[in-house]
Amino acid sequence: MKILFIPNWRVNRLSTDVPTIQAPDKQVQGEPYWFFKYFPEGTQVDIIDIGKENQFRKIEHKIKFYLVQPWKAFCVRKRYDLVISHGAQSGLVYELLTSFVKRKPQHLMFDIGGLNGARVNHTEMPLIRWALRKAPHIIVHASRQLSLYAKHYPKLTPKATFIPFGNDVDYFTPKEVAMKKQILTFGRAKRDNDTLCKAFSGIADKKGYKLVVVGAGALKEKYPDGDIEFLDPMPLKDLVTLSRESAFIVVPLPEYLYSYGQMSFLQSMALGKALIVTETTSSTDYISDAPGVERLRHAPAAWTRQP
């Protein structure tokens, strides 16, 4: 089987493995790429990524869709048995192009961001319905996202499937280290770090613990509290070390009707860390009612009222 993979990120082509680069971001010569290592032996996977930054990419970022990459995929589609797009920014445009031709391979699209960020926009939605009128197969990593299709894109529902997001347990492994009296949170996009910092600041007796915030430096002036430390984004290997040294990890997620933040809390779990995560569309499928797991039915803002 020949597969063409079109992800909405750039993939590093390497002659030898670099362990500090996560599996989705690298293709090592002579080794199967990412989750395709679980496919039958002999499966050929070619990748067309989004390419290097340039002036045209700035236009693509502005319109929030990739154009060059899907066009390249469209031009070579006949060479493949299956085309897999990861992200609607790539998949929507590719599907639109192939809707005008009769001969095309099967198209499987991972819809991470709810097509258009799950926006109920009556200008955008008819265009999306038209682009997807041939209804490709779709995989989502948040089961609640299926309700978006049922309500606004009913023709997609029969071909949409929820499959839980996987984690690289070979890279993220538990390790015994000396823990510090610190609580860690990380990530800039789609994080309610403001509420977390406000809640932590309201705790009278912090028992000697500090909150370490990675990647949200814009809040530094708002929370000059010496018990909150702000760090710049760091290499993954350094973040893993910091995670292992922390007493526990908090992933404060706002609510969106699509997948986000899953790598952060699943990787933390794979490291064997105690974890607090907001129950949202993105996380609810990964929270089990099991010993050691407790669900607190509060909106994130309640943290500031009940620190």
Q: Model regions: which residues?
A:
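Acidic donor-binding loop of glycosyltransferase active sites
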Residues: 243-258, 273-274
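Conserved catalytic-core segment of nucleotide-activated headgroup transferases in glycan assembly
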Residues: 22-23, 178-225, 229-237
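A short, active-site helix/loop in glycosyltransferases that binds the activated sugar's phosphate group
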Residues: 135-158
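Membrane-proximal helix-turn-helix segments that form the acceptor-binding/catalytic region
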Residues: 71-79, 118-138
